[in-house]
Amino acid sequence: MDYVTLGRTGLRVSVAGLGCGGFSQLGLAQGKSEADAIAIIRQALGLGVNLFDTADAYGTEGVLGKAIKSVRREDVVICTKAPFSFSNPHSTSEGIVASLDKSLRQLDTDYIDVYQLHGVPPGAYDHALSDLAPVLLREKEKGKFCYLGITETAPHDREHQTLNRAAQDGVWDVVMVGFHMMHQNARDRVFPLTRANRVGTLLMFAVRNIFSQPERLRSTLRDLAAAGEVPQSFADPPDPLAFLIHDDGASTVPDAAYRFVRHEPGVDVVLFGTGDPAHLRTNIASILKPPLPEPDRAQLSALFGHLVGVGLDAPHLSRPRR
């Protein structure tokens, strides 16, 4: 495993982080048992993963808490998030402390490494900054968590308005950002600011459905070709990203997707989710591979660098927030 320093936190974290939500929720969303989910977490630990991202909304805090009992607490970096109910301009600051305490109980831990506000839309950012952050920072002083973070609502903030501000405000130590081969605008909107201000980054949406389901990729590119957003050659090819798969390049489209984001300047940790032991191994292996060949990266930028908001399907962010 490779490790990096997570922004100004000083935390040494694995470049591959296991996400405990998404469409899999450690396999629980596909009917797997709690024991199976615990086994996935412990397999990840065995492969060198030390950063785990969960949330109240995922229902996996308790599972993560049980799984990490097999290691020393200081050897694991726990990132979790407040309920979505606080990611609106009408939420109250009083309840956020109770939610933090609830996460501590469910994780069965004395402290959380990174506590994040979850999916904050641009219209709620001022409330998050002025009303919620000061309350949470007082709880930080009590030792309940170490660093404060914020995540964007990627499907409904395609221009990264929330993180563009958060990266400059000096309050948030860590941000979670959506970035992938067909949604690249964080390169200009977010990463220069996080790098300049030493804000740690957790990367989401590296693969999701668009790069793991061939028909989803084909249908998306057909629609984009019909709209004139990509060349007509993408209108109906059987394998539209075949140019990435070759002896010196990627082995699969998901492999290409992970390697594309992993080596983007400004990305600290690439989050991935799975409930399948084989997928866990292959995902980590892809994240640890070298960058894609420069001609392939250049072609991805030329073909898709102008696209915004493609492939940002998210189970917990299905409704717009203002």
Predicted regions: what they are:
Residues 1-11, 65-69, 96-107, 189-198:
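Short amphipathic alpha-helices and their capping/turn segments at secondary-structure boundaries
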Residues 1-76, 135:
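N-terminal binding-site loop/beta-alpha segment at the start of enzyme catalytic domains
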Residues 9-16, 47-51, 72-76, 109-113, ...:
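Short, well-ordered coil/turn segments that N-cap beta-strands
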Residues 26, 42, 88-189, 199-202:
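Glycine/proline-rich, positively charged
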Residues 45, 189-322:
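Structured C-terminal cap/extension of enzyme domains
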